[in-house]
Amino acid sequence: MISPMLSKPVEELPSGKNYIYEIKLDGQRTIAEAGKKRLLLSTRGFQNVTGRYPELQGLKQCFKGEDAIFDGEIVALEKGIPSFQLLQRRMSLRDARAVTPLLETDPVLYYVFDLLHYNGRSLFRTPLMERKSLLKKIFITGEHVKLLPFFDSKEKILQQARKFGYEGVVAKRRDSFYLPGQRTSLWVKQKFQLIDSFVIGGWLE
């Protein structure tokens, strides 16, 4: 299992051509180790949660190649509206029999934003934008598996984030290596105060 790279909180995001920007989703950070016949989903605390999200088994068919390790966020939606309370209900389940009835009523999505290994090769020492480029080439969108978009413009993503009421925005240096378990200034996050409910499905998809 791999410990995900973390972002430092800041009051204001950095600007400039050295950064890209992504929406910060309020979900469960999850590393996905996928092969054509196997899938392992693990949390920041190295907990195996594969059995809690059987609808994400489709991830095994969502990329070209033999094997891959992804970094992303599991999010629960209720009629297009993200609900962390709904996700917590799924997070707490251990029994597969309890999960099954919720697959139709309370499904989850996995938003992928990084590629850590591919076809047996580690990408930790590969710059972020090269990882993003390879991820885009091999990724196949699935019913419950999506690619998280990123922006070059801080102003544009901040406008969208506030419009749709997202939790925040993450800025990442284009040349950043992937540093498992480390919280560095290469990735920084700015959180917003959220008051109302909001719809995210249309914009992210």
Predicted regions and their residues:
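Catalytic cores of nucleic-acid ligases and guanylyltransferases
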Residues: 1-205
